Each structure stands twice: as C-alpha cells, then as structure tokens.
C-alpha cells in the first residue's frame, strides 16, 4: 500500500512540476524540492535495505581488512624477530665453527711438528748408527791392513835376519816346545 501512495505522489509531483511552465520560479523550486524528497523517499524505501546492507558489508569488510592488516603486521614483526634470532644463532654458530677450526688447525700444526721432530730424531739415530757401522768397517779394514803390513814387515825382517843356522835353532826349539 505504501508503494502505491508513494508512486502516486511521485507521478502527481512530476505532473504538477511539468504543467506550470508559466508559474513563478518559487513554485518551480517548490516542486523540484518535492520531487527530490519523493525521489529520495523512493530510493530509501526501495533501496534502503540494500544500501544499509551494502554499507554494513563495506564497514565489516573495512574492519576485517584493518584486523587482517594488524594481524599481518604482527606476523611480520614475529617473522622479523625470528629472522633476527636466527641470524644471531647463525653468527654464534659461525664464531664457534671458526673457533673450533682454529683449535683444530693448531692441534694439527702441533701434531705435524711433533711428527717432524720424531722423524728428524729417527734420521739422526740412523745416521749415527750408519756412521758407527762405517767406523767399525774402517777399523776392521785398517786392522786387516795393519796386520797384513805387519806380516809383510815381519816376514821381510825374519827373512833378512834368519839365516840357515838360526832357522835350525828355531825349528829345534819349536819341536822341543811341542814335545813337552
């Protein structure tokens, strides 16, 4: 029923506004205002629910967007803090790795020095042993040479100092020494 009344008022207002071309301007202004009020009333009547629904939906949508933006901001803050924490952990692990690497390198260096010293000591011992062996060989050769020379000298002395008479006496003494 309300719809019919409003529609009738609209039609009437439009017809009055259109008929009075010769009327004064105040009447035209009045009917324009009436038409505007009627138009706004019709828009409100027919579209009020939809407009309210749209505006409420828009308000809720904006509120949800604000809440979502706040949540995203909080999440990004948490992610930033987490990234900072992970960066600090990575720095700490890197420092620990460097420290361990330096300690390992130092131990390896000391171990290498110790092994080199042991090898040098073994080489010294082998050299001393080789020198001692060579000295003994040289002494043996020298003794052999000295014995050979002594024999040669003795032989030549004996041959030059022994004559047949001395030779017979020596043979007799040796035989007597063997018999006894």
Curated annotation (Swiss-Prot):
Compartmental location: Cell inner membrane
User: Which Pfam families does this one have?
Assistant: ATP-synt_B (PF00430)
Q: Which CDD domains match?
A: ATP-synt_Fo_b
Chain ranges passing through the membrane: 26-48
In Swiss-Prot or TrEMBL terms, this protein is called: ATP synthase subunit b
Q: Which UniProt keywords apply?
A: ATP synthesis, Cell inner membrane, Cell membrane, CF(0), Hydrogen ion transport, Ion transport, Membrane, Transmembrane, Transmembrane helix, Transport
Q: What does this protein do?
A: F(1)F(0) ATP synthase produces ATP from ADP in the presence of a proton or sodium gradient. F-type ATPases consist of two structural domains, F(1) containing the extramembraneous catalytic core and F(0) containing the membrane proton channel, linked together by a central stalk and a peripheral stalk. During catalysis, ATP synthesis in the catalytic domain of F(1) is coupled via a rotary mechanism of the central stalk subunits to proton translocation.
Please give the subunit comment from the record: F-type ATPases have 2 components, F(1) - the catalytic core - and F(0) - the membrane proton channel. F(1) has five subunits: alpha(3), beta(3), gamma(1), delta(1), epsilon(1). F(0) has three main subunits: a(1), b(2) and c(10-14). The alpha and beta chains form an alternating ring which encloses part of the gamma chain. F(1) is attached to F(0) by a central stalk formed by the gamma and epsilon chains, while a peripheral stalk is formed by the delta and b chains.
Question: Which Gene Ontology cellular component annotation is one that this UniProt entry carries?
Answer: proton-transporting ATP synthase complex
What is the scientific name of the source organism? Sulfurihydrogenibium sp. (strain YO3AOP1)
Membrane protein topology class: Single-pass membrane protein
Q: Would you identify the family this protein belongs to, as annotated?
A: Belongs to the ATPase B chain family.
* Gene for this chain: atpF
Task: Output one GO MF annotation.
Answer: proton-transporting ATP synthase activity, rotational mechanism
Domain of life where this protein originates: Bacteria
């Amino acid at each position: 029923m309300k719809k019919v009344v409003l529609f009738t008022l609209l039609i009437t207002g439009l017809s009055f506004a259109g008929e009075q071309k010769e009327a004064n301007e105040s009447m035209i202004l009045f009917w324009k205002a009436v038409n505007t009020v009627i138009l706004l009333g019709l828009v409100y009547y027919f579209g009020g629910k939809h407009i309210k629904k749209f505006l409420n939906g828009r308000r809720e949508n904006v509120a949800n967007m604000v809440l979502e933006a706040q949540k995203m901001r909080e999440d990004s803050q948490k992610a930033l803090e987490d990234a900072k924490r992970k960066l600090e952990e990575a720095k700490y692990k890197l420092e620990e790795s460097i420290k361990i690497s330096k300690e390992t390198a130092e131990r390896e260096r000391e171990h290498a020095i110790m092994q080199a010293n042991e090898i040098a000591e073994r080489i010294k011992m082998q050299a001393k042993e080789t020198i001692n062996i060579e000295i003994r060989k040289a002494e043996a050769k020298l003794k052999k040479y000295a014995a050979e020379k002594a024999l040669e000298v003795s032989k030549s002395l004996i041959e030059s100092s022994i004559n047949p008479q001395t030779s017979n006496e020596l043979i007799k003494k040796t035989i007597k020494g063997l018999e006894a």
